[in-house]
Amino acid sequence: MTHDQVLDMLKYLGMGNRPEDKVKVIFVPCYQDGKDGILNKHYYDLLLGEDLSVYPSYYEPWGYTPLESVAFHVPTITTDLAGFGLWVNSLKNQHGINDGVEVLHRSDYNYSEVADGIKDTIALFSTKTDAEIKEIRKRAAQVAEQALWKHFIQYYYCLLYTSPSPRDMRRSR
């Protein structure tokens, strides 16, 4: 036993990164700042080399990592407990990993369902042809483009001009 749940599970599942294995796991439990002593590459340099990212957030007000992933044309799996996942669910014509982002429903009580959803999505993605993956990457980048500030600022203006000012709030007491 290694005293690390991730490494123990990888060993239990027989995921040993053998040459014949179709899935390779890179597990680096540290911040990728280019000086980690393992990969010595910055996070964004590593992200560019990924086929698919998985961020099964339990709670994030927004969730920048899946957005960063799709901004770099890397399809991603996230959950609806991240603001980004909720936002993606609100998009029209967004139907899962084939459109660049798979959003899984997550709660306090569905750990196994989320794990199965991740497994199933990775398995589905691994069957895609190079041409299909190229198209999925393009769609992932299109999702990221919709999250640019030039599209979101309108909502901030709406809040700014429709919310009561602090002065108005004091008067209503």
Q: What kind of feature is each model-predicted range?
A:
Residues 44-61:
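Acidic donor-binding loop of glycosyltransferase active sites
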Residues 124, 155-159, 163:
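C-terminal alpha-helix
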